[in-house]
């Protein structure tokens, strides 16, 4: 029966859990949604009475009312209500019995932004956990306002008019209270009586009041207090014995007060202290902050501190941030930051430091961010930051720096942000910058862009350094006079316009003049380009590409070989070419400093030839084998060549594609056309984006899918075979046994590559493994492709689709997968108390409550099981005792020892002689006692043991006697 009951209960629970939850009927101004099996009702501009009448007896879990019209609420007749929030309404009071209907269910109350004058009497709300009465007009608290709220853990009374607390107003909830927020009121002293002995209080906010001092013993016996906020008061003094038995304090916020002295020795009692903020006070000296093993952040901004003493922060092994900005610091003693191995941020901005002394920043070997902004520094040398090898951000803006010695930044290999804005820098000495720094901010300086500035300009271009932020004005030169007002990034292009001869020399046209301008020194690696050798741009790959690809361009001055060469030769200035040189300057400088051509450079170079008319008879005769792959990709992507309209260029592209198709078809048929290498360039001359497009099945411009397929088949046979040996030439179009590298697995690889990726960068071992259907070794891939797969890890699965079919073990697959190392974080995330919202605390409490329910359920089940075992044991023992009792009632005498009469003996003797029968002892002669009678009435006459045989004759004989 008991098992049937348990089964029935289980079925009932399953039925209830599977029942569909639906929203009830609601007023027009309300909205209903279901979240996490809870019915949430939100209303705007509605009163409680109307909502209750519409909802009726239906259950709702949460009720949110915005802009409500109630002035007084008489009743809350809602079934199952757990959360109520009345926001920005006109509510002034509650009836004493208003909460009676929800006493057993209500958990969270928020009455924020209303007109309450006093804390309502809530009654016996034994399940209430949080109460938020922020932003009302509460000025008084009844003595028994919180009686009956035995489970209350959070009480928020922020932004009211509370000037004092009755001594016993929080006695009913003191034992359970975890968070108390009374900030933004008019308290003039610590409410010690309501706080003392709050055994579970963890968060206390007394900010934005009128508290002037913390007296002795006012914060006493708070064993679990973790965070104390007394910011934005009129606090002048903290007495020596103010804190007693507050061992767990971690966060202490005292900013925006008028504290003039702070005894650091008293702070040493807080061994768990992590954050100390005494910003914007009146401290004349930095408090001694030593021997705080868990201290992570110290903020002493906005005080009157003039000096940081030696070992000011000693024995703080976990300190990560120090901020002493907005003080009057003129000196930082040597070893002030000794042994701060975990310090990553040091902010010393807005002080009066005039010089960085040797050893000033020693002891911070892992420092990453340093700000010395808005001081009075004038010079930097190699010893300034020598110990800061891990520095990534250095802010030196708004100083008076005019001299930076060579080697100042040599040891800062990880530096990527250097702010030198608003200083007195006019230029840089030789080799000041050797390693790449991605961002060097220079706005607000008086840069003199003379010849001594050339090396720095070359450094900026070669390393693609950003010199200003998007919202800042661009950097301008302030001298010499002919360069005044020239943008830094336009300087090289503007210099090209000053002399046509120098610009022509950059394009490979030798000039009779041997003049050297500023622009020539920008490009030392180009040097004199010598004679044209038949093509004006032969010494410059990009110009050579244009002139060899489009022969008609050679007729343009500066490009072709028809310009007179030799002594006395003269060239007529060409305005179009002058304008073009300015656009050419940017890409050419990058090439001159060791960079490789990229698509953006080609596009800039081509688009920088305004007003150049291209008259090209027979333009369609294009030699693709001499054309740069990037140029081909540029045109196929829709790029335009100045002087050629789009329709003409599209026609040329279509004609070229048709010629490619014709030549490929002829080659596959075994009849290659003459000069096919001009229209069918080798694979290394084709842009990788075009190869990927074709192999992915996308048609080429001007061709259909079948025509594109023929070109694909031609290039397929030009690819290396599976073993790295070039495939044999195709003898006939019908040959289907040729070695085809682009099998389905290879197509899958192409689809995973980034658009336009250069296939030549993929190792042949990987390609060969893919074409054979094997698992490739992904560790051999280049870094840029591994980074792409890191961002698209799902695409890696298709690489191993055939692994199962080939019986490849998981260990072999894992061995060939790349290892993505998690990057080291550059900084840490500071603690922010503002993230401690009521929802977070409530969520923690809800998780804790669920965990407790599970524990209680487990204990209850264990108890039931234990009781069941005890009952079974008791029943077994009882049964055994009954059996023993029955056996004890049996007469256990034998014939030789019986006390029977002679007649009985004779009868026994006669029966023995008459017929053999088993000997059966007579019944015991038990006297009739009250106990025996009771036992007899319960169990009947005592019987023999069931193992003995009953003799019918003996029974009848006894019955006659």
Swiss-Prot record:
Residues 928-943 have a biased composition (Polar residues). It is found in: Apical cell membrane. The keyword Signal applies. Residues 893-902 have a biased composition (Low complexity). Coiled coil: none annotated. LRR repeats lie at residues 60-78, 79-101, 103-124, 125-148, 150-172, 174-197, 199-222, 223-245, 247-269, 270-294, 305-316, 317-339, 340-363, 364-387, 388-411, 413-435, 437-455. Disruption phenotype: Lethal at early L1 larval stage due to excretory defects. Maternal copy required for survival. Required for apical extracellular matrix organization and epithelial junction maintenance. This is Leucine-rich repeat-containing protein egg-6.
């Amino acid at each position: 029966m008991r098992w049937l009951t348990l089964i029935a209960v289980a079925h009932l629970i399953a039925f209830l859990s599977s029942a569909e939850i639906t929203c009830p009927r609601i007023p027009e101004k309300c909205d209903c949604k279901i979240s996490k099996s809870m019915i949430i009702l939100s209303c705007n501009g509605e009163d409680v009475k109307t909502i209750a009448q519409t909802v009726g007896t239906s259950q709702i879990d949460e009720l949110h009312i915005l802009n409500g019209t109630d002035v007084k609420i008489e009743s809350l007749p809602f079934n199952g209500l757990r959360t109520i929030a009345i926001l920005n309404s006109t509510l002034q009071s509650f009836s004493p019995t208003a909460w009676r209907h929800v006493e057993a269910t209500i958990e969270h109350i928020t009455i924020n932004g209303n007109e309450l004058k006093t804390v309502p009497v809530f009654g016996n709300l034994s399940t209430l956990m949080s109460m938020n009465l922020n932003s009302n007009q509460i000025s008084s608290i009844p003595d028994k306002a919180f009686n009956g709220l035995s489970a209350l853990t959070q009480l928020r009374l922020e932004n009211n008019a509370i000037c004092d607390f009755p001594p016993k107003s929080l006695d009913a909830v003191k034992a359970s209270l975890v968070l108390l927020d009374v900030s933004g009121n008019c308290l003039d002293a610590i409410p010690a009586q309501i706080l003392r002995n709050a055994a579970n209080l963890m968060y206390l906010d007394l900010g934005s009041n009128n508290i002037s001092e913390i007296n002795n013993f006012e914060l006493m016996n708070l064993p679990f207090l973790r965070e104390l906020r007394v910011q934005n008061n009129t606090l002048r003094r903290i007495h020596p014995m103010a804190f007693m038995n507050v061992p767990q304090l971690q966060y202490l916020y005292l900013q925006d007060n008028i504290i003039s002295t702070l005894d650091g020795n008293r702070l040493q009692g807080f061994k768990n202290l992590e954050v100390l903020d005494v910003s914007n006070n009146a401290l004349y000296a930095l408090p001694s902050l030593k021997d705080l093993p868990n201290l992570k952040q110290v903020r002493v901004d906005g005080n009157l501190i003039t000096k940081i003493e030696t070992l000011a922060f000693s024995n703080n092994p976990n300190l990560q941030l120090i901020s002493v900005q907005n003080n009057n610091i003129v000196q930082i003693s040597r070893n002030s930051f000794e042994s701060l191995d975990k310090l990553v941020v040091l902010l010393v901005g807005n002080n009066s430091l005039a010089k960085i002394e040797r050893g000033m920043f020693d002891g911070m070997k892992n420092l990453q961010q340093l700000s010395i902004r808005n001081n009075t520094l004038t010079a930097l040398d190699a010893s300034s930051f020598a110990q800061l090898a891990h520095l990534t951000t250095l802010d030196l803006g708004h100083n008076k720096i005019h001299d930076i010695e060579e080697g100042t930044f040599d040891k800062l290999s990880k530096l990527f942000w250097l702010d030198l804005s608003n200083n007195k820098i006019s230029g840089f000495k030789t080799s000041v910058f050797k390693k790449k720094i991605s961002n060097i901010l220079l706005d607000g300086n008086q840069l003199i862009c003379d010849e001594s500035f050339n090396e720095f300009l070359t450094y900026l271009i070669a390393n693609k350094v950003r010199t200003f932020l998007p919202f800042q004005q661009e950097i301008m030169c302030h001298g010499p006079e002919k360069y005044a007002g020239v943008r830094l990034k336009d300087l090289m292009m503007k210099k090209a316009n000053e002399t046509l001869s120098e610009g022509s020399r950059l394009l490979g046209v030798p000039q009779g003049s041997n003049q050297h301008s500023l622009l020539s020194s920008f490009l030392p690696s180009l040097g004199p380009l010598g004679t044209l050798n038949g093509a004006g741009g032969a010494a410059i790959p990009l110009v050579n590409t244009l002139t060899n690809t489009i022969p008609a361009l050679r007729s343009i001055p500066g490009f072709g070989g028809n310009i007179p060469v030799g002594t006395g030769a003269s060239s007529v200035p060409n305005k179009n070419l002058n304008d073009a040189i300015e656009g050419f300057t940017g890409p050419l400088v990058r090439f001159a400093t060791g960079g490789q051509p990229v698509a953006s450079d080609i596009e800039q170079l081509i688009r920088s030839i305004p007003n150049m008319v291209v008259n090209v008879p027979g333009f369609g005769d294009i030699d693709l084998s001499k054309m740069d792959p990037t140029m081909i990709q540029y045109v196929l992507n829709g790029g335009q060549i100045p002087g050629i309209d789009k329709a003409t260029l599209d026609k040329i592209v279509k004609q070229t594609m048709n010629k490619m198709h014709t030549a490929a078809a002829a080659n596959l048929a075994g009849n290659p056309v003459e000069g096919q290498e001009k229209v069918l360039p080798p694979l290394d001359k084709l842009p990788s984006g075009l190869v990927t497009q074709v192999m992915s099945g996308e048609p080429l411009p001007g061709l259909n899918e079948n025509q594109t397929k023929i070109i694909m088949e031609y290039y397929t046979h030009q690819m290396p075979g599976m073993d790295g040996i070039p495939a044999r030439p195709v003898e006939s179009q019908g040959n289907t046994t040729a070695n085809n590298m682009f099998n389905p697995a290879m197509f899958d690889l192409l689809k995973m590559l980034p658009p336009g990726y250069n296939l030549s960068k993929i190792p042949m071992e990987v390609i060969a493994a893919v074409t054979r259907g094997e698992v490739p070794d992904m560790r051999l891939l280049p870094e840029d492709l591994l980074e792409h797969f890191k961002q698209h890890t799902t695409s890696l699965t298709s690489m191993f689709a055939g692994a199962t079919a080939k019986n490849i073990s998981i260990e072999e697959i894992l061995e060939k997968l790349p290892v993505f190392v998690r990057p080291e974080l550059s900084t840490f995330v500071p603690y922010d108390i503002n993230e401690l919202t009521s929802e977070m605390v409530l969520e923690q409490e809800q998780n804790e409550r669920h965990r407790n329910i599970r524990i209680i359920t487990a204990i209850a089940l264990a108890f039931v099981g234990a009781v069941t075992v005890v009952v079974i044991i008791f029943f077994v023992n009882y049964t055994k005792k009954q059996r023993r009792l029955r056996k004890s009632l049996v007469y256990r005498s034998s014939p030789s020892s019986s006390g029977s009469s002679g007649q009985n003996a004779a009868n026994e003797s006669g029966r023995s002689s008459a017929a053999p029968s088993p000997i059966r002892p007579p019944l015991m002669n038990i006297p009739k006692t009250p106990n025996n009678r009771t036992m007899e009435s319960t169990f009947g006459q005592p019987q023999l043991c069931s193992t003995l045989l009953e003799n019918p004759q003996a029974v009848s004989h006894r019955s006659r006697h």
